[in-house]
Design a protein with these regions (language model features):
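Feature captures the catalytic cores and cofactor-binding loops of soluble hydro-lyases/lyases
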Residues: 1-160, 174-216
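C-terminal binding/interaction regions
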Residues: 164
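Channel- or pocket-lining gating/hinge segments that regulate access to a cavity or pore
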Residues: 170-172
Length: 216
């Protein structure tokens, strides 16, 4: 399994998306406005899902304890995916959560919402994908409802056990049932693309190369 995750991490989303299309999975890309904090950032691995909802200042609950519960349950090697639900103003992730997640062995985070402490997160090199930035704390605005459960981000349903690959071009969810097939098929195509790329750079003809390798 670790070898397969390593192979997934060496691939890129465009190649994986093509394979998913060929296998009939046409709706696996998260919203296109979820972007990496730095262009070079990449995430790959099994998902750890988090679902939240808006809260009010005076509801008498300190949501930070629930946040700590969520952090304690992160499996080593997982990529955290946060769906904030109906809260669109606060930062749902920050520096201290990042450092705690690193302690737990998390490989990155994808948030369909807000991020703060961006420079500090860049300093520790934790791959983070987010929709927007906000200085506002989530403590008075947002609760974590549940984690490690099925969630929906945009139009994509994500199940515990699924896999994620994210890079500068976007974030893809790969269902657990087909992960091995997707990786193996994409590696085979990527090998052909490497040959075609080298041939083109050496003056090859794209039509002839396409007829031979069927990649373009």
């Amino acid at each position: 399994m670790n070898e397969m995750i390593g192979q997934l991490g060496n691939l890129y989303t465009g190649a994986i998306a093509d394979t998913l299309d060929e296998l009939g999975y046409h709706n696996q890309c998260l919203p296109s406005d979820i972007r990496p904090l730095a262009d070079s950032m990449k995430v790959a691995g099994p998902v750890y899902t988090v679902l939240g909802k808006r809260r009010h200042y005076d509801d008498g609950v300190d949501p930070r304890y629930r946040q700590m519960d969520m952090l304690d349950a992160i499996p080593s090697g997982a990529v955290i995916i946060v769906e904030p639900g109906n809260e669109f103003s606060a930062a749902h992730w920050g520096e201290l959560m990042t450092n705690t997640a690193l302690q737990r062995g998390a490989k990155g985070i994808v948030i369909n919402g807000g991020l703060r402490d961006s420079l500090q997160i860049l300093d520790v090199g934790f791959p983070a994908f987010r929709k927007y930035h906000s200085p506002l704390t989530a403590a008075y605005r947002w609760n974590i409802d549940s984690f490690h459960i099925p969630i929906k981000v945009g139009n994509v349903t994500i199940e515990p056990g699924d896999y994620v690959l994210g890079d500068i071009d976007g974030v893809l969810i790969i269902p657990q049932a087909i992960i091995q097939e997707v990786v193996e098929q994409t590696v085979a195509v990527a090998t052909k693309e490497d040959v075609v790329r080298a041939s083109l750079q050496d003056g090859g003809n794209i039509r002839e190369l396409f007829e031979e390798y069927k990649v373009f």
